[in-house]
Amino acid sequence: MGILNVTPDSFADGGRYNSFNKAVHHAREMISEGVDIIDIGGESTRPGAERVSEDEELDRVIPVIEELADEGVRISIDTMRASTARAAIGAGAHIINDVSGGLADPKMLTTAAELNSPYIAMHWRGQSKDMNSLAIYNDVVLDVISHLKERISAALEAGIKHENLIIDPGIGFAKDAHHNWEIIDHIEEFVALGFPVLIGASRKRFLGGDTPDGREAASVALTKRLSTTGIWGVRVHSVKPHKDVFAK
């Protein structure tokens, strides 16, 4: 899953692709490198980020989705809003990637069920501006699994089909470096829940390095490690190095 942030303030690439032409060009580069899914987001979820308006989010993502809809690659919409998810699916997206797991918008789960779209539910403890203060756990693996089980139940009760549900333990969201590594060390326990597992760890601070770009080698090494664990996918900034790992 290749990341396409059409935002000015995402942690790793904010501002690089926040115009229509730059976003579409980068998406086509990822397609040429063999990306399976392009995850398009118009609202940063980095720690400390403020929400943007619905209109701003739609203005950022819908034209890009419409342009890429016929490129032969699956598109996911990275959003916490049911209205944005509905508009994106209508514009040609295929998957809803909701970092809040349906908690930010009470209409999201029923909307995903109605649209019959694959839905990614992530472990989430609150808005981005508050997440650093929420990284407190008794046992991070057990706590995150317990939370995901609750979101799985809520999603299924809302009408989302079992085969449409994907889970994400939320690496870097209300978690410190130790928490992130604990989850990675026990990722098979998440796979054992019986749903596809997505991991989004690309270029995040816990990997070390002074800058996001400086964490790329560590990101690829982590993908190599995860490639044998049975996870469904990795969400990454650079497609080719990660594809090469899976090809070996």
Language model features: what each stretch is:
Residues M1, V35, R74, H94, ...:
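Hydrophobic "anchor" residues on beta-strands that sit immediately upstream
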Residues M1-G2, E29-I40:
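N-terminal glycine-rich anion-binding loops that anchor highly charged ligand groups
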Residues D39-G41, R74-I75:
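Short, conserved structural micro-motifs that define repeat-unit consensus positions
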Residues A12-N21, H25-H26, T45-E67, E71-R74, ...:
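Active-site-adjacent loop and "lid" segments of alpha/beta metabolic enzymes
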Residues S32, V73, R151-N164:
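Phosphate/pyrophosphate-binding loops at sites that engage ATP/ADP/AMP, CoA/4′-phosphopantetheine
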Residues N5-D9:
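Short polar catalytic/cofactor-binding loops
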